[in-house]
């Protein structure tokens, strides 16, 4: 059944699962919820009709943020230790980007952008193409 929908069954310990998915799934959902909330707060604070001008990025994040809130609350609470560590790492990296932007550190920010772009290439090479129904596995 799992293979029929394009998935692969991988056995791993609960601890390993929770650590991996805290970064690959749980943190991205948390970021999506927070980005949409930030847009909502910005809209109220600045009195701009921000949502009307939502670009592809915000629209993509809002799709994730529209996920089932009860399920995600439970995931966040049940994997709080690993998610908290993932948040700390994210904040550290976000602050590093902020520092580079504020200091106009061209070399550092370009290195970050190039290195993170390589992750997308690796994902595609693993045949995880999100634009295909089976993630490009066939």
Per-segment meaning from a language model:
Residues 22, 26, 89, 115-118:
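Charged, amphipathic alpha-helical oligomerization/scaffolding segments
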């Amino acid at each position: 059944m799992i293979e029929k929908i394009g998935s692969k069954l991988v056995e791993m310990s609960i601890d390993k699962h929770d650590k991996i998915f805290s970064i690959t799934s749980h943190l991205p959902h948390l970021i999506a919820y927070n980005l949409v909330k930030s847009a909502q707060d910005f809209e109220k604070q600045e009195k701009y009709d921000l949502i009307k001008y939502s670009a592809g990025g915000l629209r993509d994040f809002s799709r994730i943020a529209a996920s089932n809130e009860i399920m995600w609350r439970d995931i966040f609470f049940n994997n709080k230790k690993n998610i908290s560590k993932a948040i700390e790492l994210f904040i550290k990296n976000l602050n590093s980007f902020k520092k580079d932007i504020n200091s106009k550190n061209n070399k550092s920010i370009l290195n970050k952008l190039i290195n993170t772009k390589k992750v997308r290439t690796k994902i595609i090479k693993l045949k995880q193409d999100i634009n295909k129904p089976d993630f490009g596995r066939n």
